[in-house]
Amino acid sequence: MEFKEFQDLKLSALGFGAMRLPTVGGDPNGAVDEKLTAEMVAYARAQGVNYFDTAYGYHDGMSEVVMGNILGQYPRESFYLADKFPGYDLANMDKVEEIFEEQLKKCGVDYFDFYLFHNVYEKNIEPYMDEKYGIMDYLWRQKQAGRIRHLGFSAHGRYETLKRFLEAYGDRMEFCQIQLNYLDWKLQDAKAKVELLNEYKIPIWVMEPLRGGKLATLSQENEAKLKA
């Protein structure tokens, strides 16, 4: 396993995402197969993976519970856990404290190693930045209290939206997670986003490197283009 230095940490270059966990009977809408997931986590750890990523809405809220149950079997200092505030749903904006406390409980931890503003984009940037909801203020207090070790954000929005968020909070963001792969390099303007984040000296976390597996298998024509 390759490791990347982040401040005083050494993070596995490959993380374990808990958005698409195996389900009972392979039913995409079924319950998470916790036994199989535990086997996957054990295998990943054996290969050196130490970064695990979950979120409030994954698997209808059960991803956090399952990952908490499984990771709780290991020493807390042996893994890094990332979770996210679900601002993709505007109904959550006035519930930041309630949701954060719930997430800690579901994951069975006292702190998150990494915590993100989930999916900053055009429809939620206003409430994310609205002092009425106080999301940044609350999360910053949790960081100061040690309940969030590193604060960052993920982004699916346009370049202009990313720039605006950075202009407001770039001095407080320690990392950013963006969709980065050979398709989105141009399709979602990832190249320009990378350059912007580099200007702010904000480390980049890669998500969707294969777009959920869709980029793993190509037609012969497109495979030839990539190799050309």
Regions found by a protein language model. Give the residues of each.
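Conserved, mostly hydrophobic/aromatic
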Residues: 14-16, 44, 52, 67, ...
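Active-site mouth loops of central-metabolism enzymes
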Residues: 20-35, 84-94, 123-128, 221-223, ...
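Active-site groove signature of glycoside hydrolases
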Residues: 104-127
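Acidic (Asp/Glu)-rich catalytic clusters
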Residues: 6-10, 45-46, 68-78, 101-110, ...
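Short, acidic/polar
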Residues: 30-44, 91-108, 157-167
